[in-house]
């Protein structure tokens, strides 16, 4: 075994331990990953040594842990070893940041100037806090500078957002710590500078977004007391209107990075910052106490056990994405606590039947939710309750299976209740949201039954048996027969009781009996509110399960009243009058609306290229290389000769100038040349020897593209049968080194597209899964055994495809569409190896099944560290299932975000830093380092709060009834963080709810299948009318005010201020040139904003106003806007008249 794996298993468990087999499986699994990674790395290194890429070696270094990732990211030799020593010494992550920063400034990692050392120290601290995964340390901190007035400035940039609030504040704290060590003074702002901050931060909130906007008093308190000058690069085009041109502020534009650090960092994370200050013992931060007291606790209202409806999730409503439930409204989703094997980690579980009826909610669709967090990805959970509906014939039916939903969908008239929504305790803990009353479900009831001495499976019992258990064992009424008594008023209860007693009758036939009630509209409404299933036949309401119902009404089997009604609310009355315990069925409803639709699609740039090779304007609007090879600039010009900005390299052997790493003539490695635009001279230094200006590694020069293309086709042995090969208009990298044309030709052949870094990627919505069935993912038991899965999650030998198996942390289940794309990529890689690198093929894949067992890289857009994964199967959903640890290693949760997969060999062969854009944020979304082994201790801490138990204890459910803090229950519910001290952190996780199939429900949301906005809005409003928990008039009002009106007004403003664009070269003009055409290419100009973009939502807005109860104010706004649009675009009716008409 690789010695580096010893760190993950410091203790060898004895074979007597019942989990020994699990840990052994994980050991072998990690070893197999490392062996395969090493094999593929060697192949890639051999290919790279041929000199056909921008570098001679693979450009994705391997890191086996957080310490190695940080070292490779910061390029400090010996840093990884030191971090591991400090970790083994028991230091917290925060203290390690300060210790390492201290040692960097002291020169223990190499002597460097004071300013550079402080810069490295601050960046390294952020890298340690973010596990070396995100790009924030290199992209989010632009620079650190010692001001001439002897104080420290830290310039933040937009990508600092990806670090999160805690890492942002630690950068400020570490900067202060090393400032003191370096004997640099503190920052003392002027009154004008303080007021500049007070204006600029709210302005950033307007033009961008902030989670939290501090008050002017809080901003003043932070800025006037912070010993570091929190500065930033200008990130927005907006400028401040006051306090401009200040001597010590370098820009009038908004500095996004600064705003983020002060608002989402110091202001929002003040309590955490105070804790770190106390732990490290830094003086001068006593003012944090005033900030914490002044800022208050954003959750303080909810801590008072008064949980009010929250409509924040409705504030940014989008047309075509339906509201499923208004805040905490009857008929909305009923909260059920638990974690299914495919849920948790910011997801919400929904019954597949609910998904099918709603149409807009598919597997992976994002729901914006009322609580506990902001959003969650949808997963199917068949073991929770589905919706209750009213059919067109009046029947009320509970639909719990997908087959029932499919059979009844056309008959549904109204959705009375959306069913249950499964949210795990860990999400409440992560969001620090008070626990709200749990629905009365089987997992709660069975624990009360066991407490009373009952044993056995009572999941499905008859009504008679349920009542017998209540009478004999004094257990509460079974959840199946507990109705929503708390949802009706005392008056409704009295009316219902009297009506049933006076007018009802019990009729029996063939051993079955029913309760018949004469049809009464008020009784019908009350029964629907109770969610009591019944049928409407002729003029009668027929109730088949009636015994528990009449018992709760205080009636005997002859429908005679047993006793009188007394009590403050219906539930109290029911408990008193029935003689049995009846729990509240569903006190907590969760409001929700559709967020982003699910996604599983290949990554394409806009427009999508096949190769990173510049063609300038020669390729036309499509950047087509086939057009460019036939391009002639003038009558006498050479065909296929284009002029582009491209790298300058020179062969030291034969002197030929080229842009490749290896000379095409003599095979020698070329040297980089630099060009000075001022002196127009080439030299070997990056600084001009004449004028001292920084030179560029590229210049604009002629390239014989036709010759290069013909050579590439001949080299590959391909026929020139390609219609289109799309390149790029120009390279955005520092030296503008292009890809070899052979790669683009082969990508076109296999239908593969290239991303900015040279890789081919597939994007998919993130979904979690800890356990799977072989049948669900299309893999045989034999293949799974080959991959190291020998037992199911309970320890039994793996024999059939329906056993439940625990997923290994780095195994992924790809969407089928993703597997098909990666199959094309695999074939492209094999062709590349054989025809371009002259090596043996690697994948030899004929079908998607051949990809099982192969390694991939997972990467999130805001990070710079890929995570090694292994394909073990495929699911017919538009999302990617993977272990929560895998997602957390990418610093993601599963609330609806999407990440990408790429084949490992594609990344190792084709990725190059030389292709990355030379701009702020250019190194984000690039695998600058690869995490080989995922250690749960070193992933995003959110997953540490995920619960891993088989059931929540009775104490938990009782605690929810008193709105307990989730922290009170930490000792009662085992979580991932309780396992971090030993090997059991990798395996042996459990779940509370099973599901029939992880792909059940809807595959594609109606939002994606409906093509026009008109169809989407019509269906959205149709659904709003159908769902009892939705106020369709409020939805119409919000859609107009939040989406349509701002869009129309914005486009109307943009139309009057628009630029004009050349249809050929894309050059934009603020005013039309006097010649009336493009000054560069002579082509015609067109508008950039068209009248159709202004008018597109006008008719839809009028439809909503006419058909729904929209406020008069909104109607008048729309009417005035329509008049303004007509005055701009519609001419009055013209009529030819003669002078005699005026006589």
UniProtKB/Swiss-Prot annotation:
Citing just one GO molecular function, the answer is:
DNA-directed DNA polymerase activity
Q: Name the UniProt key words of this record, in alphabetical order.
A: DNA replication, DNA-binding, DNA-directed DNA polymerase, Exonuclease, Hydrolase, Multifunctional enzyme, Nuclease, Nucleotidyltransferase, Transferase
Please tell me whether the keyword Nucleotidyltransferase is annotated for this protein: yes
Q: Keyword Glycosyltransferase: yes or no? A: no
Got any disulfides in this one, which pairs? none
Pfam families in alphabetical order: PolC_DP2_cat, PolC_DP2_central, PolC_DP2_N
Biological process annotations from GO = DNA catabolic process; DNA-templated DNA replication
Q: InterPro entries attached here?
A: PolC_DP2, PolC_DP2_cat_dom, PolC_DP2_central_dom, PolC_DP2_N
What's its catalytic activity?
DNA(n) + a 2'-deoxyribonucleoside 5'-triphosphate = DNA(n+1) + diphosphate; Exonucleolytic cleavage in the 3'- to 5'-direction to yield nucleoside 5'-phosphates
EC id:
2.7.7.7, 3.1.11.1
Q: Which family does it belong to?
A: Belongs to the archaeal DNA polymerase II family.
Q: Quaternary structure per UniProt?
A: Heterodimer of a large subunit and a small subunit.
Question: What does the record give as the function of this protein?
Answer: Possesses two activities: a DNA synthesis (polymerase) and an exonucleolytic activity that degrades single-stranded DNA in the 3'- to 5'-direction. Has a template-primer preference which is characteristic of a replicative DNA polymerase.
Please name the HAMAP family in this protein's record.
DNApol_II_L_arch
Q: What is this protein called?
A: DNA polymerase II large subunit
From which organism does this entry originate? Archaeoglobus fulgidus (strain ATCC 49558 / DSM 4304 / JCM 9628 / NBRC 100126 / VC-16)
């Amino acid at each position: 075994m690789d010695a580096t794996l010893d760190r993950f298993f410091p203790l060898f468990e004895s074979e007597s331990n019942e989990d020994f087999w699990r840990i052994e499986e994980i050991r072998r699994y990690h070893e197999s990953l490392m062996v395969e990674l090493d094999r593929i790395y060697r192949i890639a290194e051999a290919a790279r040594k041929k000199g056909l890429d921008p570098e001679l070696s693979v450009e994705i270094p391997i890191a086996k842990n957080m310490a190695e990732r940080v070292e490779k990211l910061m390029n400090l030799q010996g840093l990884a070893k030191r971090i591991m020593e400090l970790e083994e010494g028991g230091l917290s992550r925060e203290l390690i940041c300060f210790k390492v920063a201290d040692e960097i400034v002291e020169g223990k990692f190499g002597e460097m100037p004071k300013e550079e050392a402080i810069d490295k120290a601050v960046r390294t601290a952020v890298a340690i806090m973010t596990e070396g995964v995100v790009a924030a340390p290199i992209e989010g901190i632009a620079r650190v500078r010692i001001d001439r007035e002897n104080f420290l400035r830290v310039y933040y940039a937009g990508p600092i957002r990806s670090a999160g609030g805690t890492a942002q504040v630690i950068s400020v704290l570490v900067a202060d710590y090393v400032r003191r060590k370096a004997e640099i003074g503190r920052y003392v702002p002027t009154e004008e500078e303080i007021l500049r901050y007070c204006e600029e931060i709210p302005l950033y909130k307007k033009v961008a977004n902030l989670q939290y906007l501090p008050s002017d008093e809080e901003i003043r308190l932070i800025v006037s007391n912070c010993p570091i000058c929190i500065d930033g690069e200008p990130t927005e085009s907006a400028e401040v209107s006051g306090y401009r041109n200040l001597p010590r502020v370098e820009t009038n534009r908004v500095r996004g990075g600064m705003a983020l650090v002060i608002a989402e960092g110091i202001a929002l994370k003040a309590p955490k910052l105070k804790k770190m200050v106390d732990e490290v013992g830094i003086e001068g931060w006593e003012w944090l106490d005033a900030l914490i007291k002044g800022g208050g606790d954003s959750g303080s209202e909810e801590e008072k056990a008064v949980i009010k409806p929250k409509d924040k999730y409705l504030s940014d409503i989008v047309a075509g994405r339906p509201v499923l439930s208004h805040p905490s409204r009857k008929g909305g989703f009923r909260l059920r606590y638990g974690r299914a094997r495919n849920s948790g980690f910011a997801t919400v579980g929904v019954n597949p039947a609910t998904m099918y009826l709603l149409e807009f909610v598919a597997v992976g669709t994002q729901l914006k939710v009322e609580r506990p967090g902001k959003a969650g990805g949808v997963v199917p959970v068949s073991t929770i309750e589905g919706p209750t509906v009213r059919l067109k014939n009046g029947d009320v039916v509970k639909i719990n299976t997908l087959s029932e939903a499919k059979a009844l969908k056309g008959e549904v008239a109204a959705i009375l209740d959306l069913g249950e929504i499964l949210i795990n305790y860990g999400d409440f803990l992560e969001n620090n949201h008070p626990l709200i009353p749990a629905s009365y479900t089987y997992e709660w009831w069975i624990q009360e039954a066991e407490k009373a001495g009952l044993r056995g499976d009572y999941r499905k019992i008859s009504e008679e048996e349920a009542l017998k258990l209540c009478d004999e064992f004094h257990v509460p009424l079974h959840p199946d027969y507990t109705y929503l008594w708390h949802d009706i008023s005392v008056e409704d209860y009295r009316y219902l009781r009297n009506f049933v007693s006076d007018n009802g009758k019990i009729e029996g036939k063939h051993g079955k009996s029913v309760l018949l009630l004469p049809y009464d509209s008020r009784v019908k409404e009350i029964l629907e509110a109770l969610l009591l299933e019944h049928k409407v036949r002729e003029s009668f309401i027929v109730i088949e399960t009636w015994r528990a119902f009449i018992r709760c009404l205080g009636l005997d089997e002859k429908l005679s009243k047993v006793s009188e009604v007394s009590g403050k609310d219906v539930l109290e009355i029911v408990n008193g009058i029935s003689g049995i315990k009846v729990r509240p069925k569903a006190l907590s409803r969760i409001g929700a609306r559709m967020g982003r639709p699910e996604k599983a699609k290949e990554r394409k740039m806009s427009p999508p290229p096949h190769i990173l090779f510049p063609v300038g304007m020669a390729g036309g609007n499509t950047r087509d290389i086939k057009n460019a090879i036939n391009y002639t600039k003038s009558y006498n010009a050479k065909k296929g000769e284009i002029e582009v900005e491209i790298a300058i390299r020179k062969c030291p052997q034969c002197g030929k100038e080229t842009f490749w790493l290896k000379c095409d003539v003599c095979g020698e490695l070329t040297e980089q040349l630099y060009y000075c635009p001022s002196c127009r001279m080439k030299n070997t230094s990056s600084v001009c020897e004449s004028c001292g200006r920084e030179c560029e590694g590229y210049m604009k020069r002629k390239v014989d593209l036709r010759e290069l293309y013909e050579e590439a086709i001949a080299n590959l042995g391909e026929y020139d049968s390609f219609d289109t090969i799309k390149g790029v208009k120009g390279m955005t990298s520092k030296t503008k080194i292009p890809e070899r044309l052979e790669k683009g030709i082969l990508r076109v052949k296999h239908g593969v597209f290239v991303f900015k870094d040279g890789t081919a990627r597939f994007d998919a919505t993130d979904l979690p899964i800890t356990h799977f069935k072989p049948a669900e993912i299309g893999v045989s038991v034999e293949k799974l055994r080959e991959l190291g899965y020998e037992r199911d999650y309970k320890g039994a030998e793996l024999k059939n495809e329906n056993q439940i198996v625990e997923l290994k942390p780095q195994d992924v289940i790809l969407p089928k569409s993703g597997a098909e794309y990666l199959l094309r990529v695999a074939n492209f890689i094999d062709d590349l190896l054989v025809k371009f690198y002259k090596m043996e093929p690697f994948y030899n894949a004929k079908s998607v099944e051949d990809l099982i067992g192969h390694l991939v890289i997972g990467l999130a857009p805001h990070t710079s560290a890929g995570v090694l994964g292994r394909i073990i199967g495929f699911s017919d959903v538009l999302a990617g299932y993977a272990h929560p640890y895998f997602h957390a290693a990418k610093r993601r949760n599963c609330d609806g975000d999407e990440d990408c997969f790429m084949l490992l060999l594609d990344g190792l062969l084709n990725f190059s830093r030389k292709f990355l854009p030379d701009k702020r944020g250019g190194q984000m979304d690039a695998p600058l380092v690869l995490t080989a082994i995922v250690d749960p201790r070193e992933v995003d801490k959110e997953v540490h709060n995920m619960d891993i138990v088989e059931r929540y204890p009775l104490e938990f459910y009782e605690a929810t009834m008193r709105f307990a803090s989730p922290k009170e229950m930490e000792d009662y519910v085992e979580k991932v963080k309780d396992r971090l001290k030993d090997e059991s952190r990798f395996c042996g996780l459990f779940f509370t709810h099973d599901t029939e199939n992880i792909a059940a429900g809807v595959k594609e949301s109606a939002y994606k299948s409906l093509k026009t906005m008109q169809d989407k809005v019509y269906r959205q409003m149709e659904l709003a009318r159908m769902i009892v928990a939705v106020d369709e008039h409020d939805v119409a009002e919000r859609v107009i005010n939040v989406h349509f009106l701002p869009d129309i007004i914005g486009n109307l403003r943009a139309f009057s201020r628009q630029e004009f664009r050349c249809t050929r070269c894309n050059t934009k003009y603020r005013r039309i040139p006097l010649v009336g055409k493009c000054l560069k290419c002579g082509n015609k100009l067109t508008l950039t904003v068209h009248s159709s973009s202004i008018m597109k939502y006008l008719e839809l807005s009028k439809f909503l106003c006419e058909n729904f109860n929209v406020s008069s104010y909104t109607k008048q706004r729309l009417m005035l806007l329509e008049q303004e649009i007509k005055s701009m675009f519609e001419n009055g009716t013209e009529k030819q008249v003669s002078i005699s008409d005026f006589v």
